[in-house]
Amino acid sequence: NLDCINFPMRKTKIIATLGPPAEDPKILIKLLEQVDVIRINLAHGTWDKRDPDNHTDKIKNVQKIAKTIKKPIAILVDLKGNKIRIGDLIKQTIDLKKDSIINVRFTDERVARSIDEIVVNAGYVFENIEKEDIILIDDGLIKLLVNETDDENQTLACTVQEGGLLSRRKGFEVIDKVITKSGLGEEDQEDLRKLAALNVDWVALSFVNQASDVNQAREVLSSIDNQMRVIAKIERLSALKQLYWIIKASDGVMVARGDLALESGPGELTGLQKTIINQTVAGKKIVITATQMMESMKTSRVPTRAEVFDVSNAACSGVDAIML
């Protein structure tokens, strides 16, 4: 009985991340009939119109079908931000076995050369990594221990501590080290202009550290006379120190639990989520809870009890939307 919760209940919206199956118009229609917002992540796919997975077509298809079914569907797009990601693998996926050796090479090349190699297109990161550092990939699902560093070839020889199936473009982090740059890069600024031309409703800024990051996006939009609304993704502990000002500068915030948990540890995440939600609600701004909500339904038709509780708890906490 939710009436026992001493909190003004809201009609929590559903945000759905657009995946490859939704490229089928029939599936996309069914999806749009059930959700309120479609989210597109610019970290996956390209702007190249020759690419069937290009961003422009995805956005226009959603807008076209929403108009056809006469349902107002908002579009939320995540900018890439400065998050470090691995490049393309030599195969669609590789199976990293526990205790096996994998090389991480920092290079401008976008594709790995072999089955036992991962590439990262951020050379400056190599200088910050040392022997015995712990690397986390794909929100910590893959865990590597750095055994050796090869300065000449900018390569790390690593042992797989936690393995599993790995696919391309997954996030790359190093425990206890900040390797992402703050602010809006040139590519993000250009992407913002493209999204404005496509009449996107919301943009989510990745790895916001301070209010000036949000203001920078506002300045870009203002220069082209666009009023797109801005969501600040809270993914860094450093952002919590500036949370009041970030909330004030933005139209809303997203509790991006994947990267936030990597910094805080899973034990602290519940309290941090509550803090972010409460402060955002108090500031009368939009708040979204994201990452691994109903995650098991990628492979199961029924969510786990823990997932049901997670979604219900977020709704009871006063979030405006949950993101799948």
Model-identified regions with their sequence ranges:
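Non-catalytic helical/linker scaffolds that mediate oligomerization, partner binding
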Residues: 2-324
